[in-house]
Each structure stands twice: as C-alpha cells, then as structure tokens.
Amino acid sequence: MTRVRISEDALQDLNDGFLFYEAQEVGLGDYFAACLRADIERLKVSAGVHRVVYQDYRRLLSKVFPYGIFYTMEGDCGVVWAVIDLRKDPAWVREKLKE
C-alpha cells in the first residue's frame, strides 16, 4: 500500500469545495467531503497508475463530483497537491499547478 500525503493547498481546495456545495444544499457539502475522501483513499492502492497530465502531475478523477485530484509520486508516497473542479478553464488549471 502506498502512503498518501495531502498538501495544505489541497486541503484548502477541499474546504472550498465543501463550502460551495454546502451553500447549494445543506448536507451536500458533507456528501462532497465523504466522496472526495474516499477518492483520495483509493490512491493508497492505485497511486502511480494514473496518466501524467501536466509536468509530473497525475490526475485521479472523482467518481461522483466533477473534480480531479492532482498528485505526484515522491518515492513510495503519493502527494496530493490540488483538488480542482474540472469545469474550470484548462489554462487556469495549468496555472494553479504551476504555483
């Protein structure tokens, strides 16, 4: 099993998504958080198999929400750097990953 670490930026992305969905409907934020948590947990068994989409970043697609989990491999550890709504402009996504 691969270790998974989540960066502060990715945690902020998750919080922003939670707040957005919770504002749409009470309880939807909790559902979003649970789904994305499960998606990130999948990295423990599948990290490294996703294709590289930008520089060294790999992307795991969320099973429920239109989000991508962007991560890199550092040895035997998958590091989640960003959790991004994929409805955003691809140029914006690339700029965010450059940061």
Enumerate the predicted regions with their spans.
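Arg/Lys-rich, positively charged N-terminal/basic patches that mediate binding to nucleic acids
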Residues: 1-33
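Active-site micro-motifs of SAM-dependent methyltransferase domains
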Residues: 12, 42, 88
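Short, hydrophobic secondary-structure boundary micro-motifs
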Residues: 30-31, 51-53, 92
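Basic/aromatic recognition patch in beta-strand/loop cores that engages polyanionic ligands
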Residues: 38, 42-79
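Enriched for short, Lys/Arg-rich terminal
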Residues: 68, 72-99
